[in-house]
Amino acid sequence: SMADRIFVMKDGAVIQVGTPREIYTTANSPFIADFIGIMNFVSGTVVDIHTARCGDSNITCDTQFYANGQNVRLAIRPESVVLSHAQKSATDGTSSNNIEATIDEIEFLGSFERVYLDAGSLTNNLMMVDIPSTAARGLELNANTGINIHLPASDIRVYADEA
């Protein structure tokens, strides 16, 4: 069982207070996002109020609090990334935030599988995707094969890149 409210501290100071769900889904810093679970981080640059350029890809996300040209870190939880073999096209209205990737490794963890992806057009780091085992069986995932990933804009957190 977990507490009703969590106080997250760093260097002796409280940096966020909220319910477990609030802290997990709306962490107010990369430190908290990474501390309260696994997170994929992708570096990018703001190009307009709803878009960041990450590698070779434009990602739709909420960049309204950042200036054009500002370096940012996009963050998305492994369970929020959607896998598909279907190529999304501009005519079906879902082309935004769809990236081609290659499956690097699949780790079976019982009720879910963790899939490590090489999404080179987006980031040089491997991305992690957690998918229920039943869904993974339906997709017939195999290492060294291509897959399409979708990053739902509503699940992407944007942070200033402080590096």
Feature names for model-found ranges:
Residues 1-57, 79:
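Internal alpha/beta loop-helix hairpins
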Residues 39-41, 49-163:
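Non-catalytic connector elements of ABC transporters
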